[in-house]
């Protein structure tokens, strides 16, 4: 597997970072969640993701919103979804970054998400046998998530 670099250079003294690789989640859900979480405080982001998993707060879909139903509540836009699987995976990556910050001696109460992004991973290629000796591709896309947490003052 190729070495994957972080998109943003950060000062290692007051930042902690983590990466989730080869996650089997939707690329579109990951893009919308990363856009929504960017710049949030870590505690607020974890609470937000837990509310999304519990189907209480929808994630506004601003780019990939074709044929999406409207959701009640103030979410910024009218259309949104509850990407539970992607929220759980991103929550695991954020927890890993928080533990890395604890290991470095940073104050976990004063952490905010400086950078979060989703990148396309490799495609797991499979084939489904069909009638009359044919086969159809059944591919699974994977996603890489990068998180950099910064201690603010």
From Swiss-Prot:
One of its GO terms (biological process) is cytoplasmic translation. Gene3D superfamilies: Ribosomal protein L22/L17. One of its GO terms (molecular function) is rRNA binding. It holds the Pfam family Ribosomal_L22. InterPro entries: Ribosomal_uL22, Ribosomal_uL22_CS, Ribosomal_uL22_euk/arc, Ribosomal_uL22_sf. It comes from the Archaea. Keywords: Ribonucleoprotein, Ribosomal protein, RNA-binding, rRNA-binding. This protein binds specifically to 23S rRNA. It makes multiple contacts with different domains of the 23S rRNA in the assembled 50S subunit and ribosome. Part of the 50S ribosomal subunit. Belongs to the universal ribosomal protein uL22 family. NCBIfam families: PRK04223.1, uL22_arch_euk. This is Large ribosomal subunit protein uL22. It comes from Methanococcus maripaludis (strain DSM 14266 / JCM 13030 / NBRC 101832 / S2 / LL).
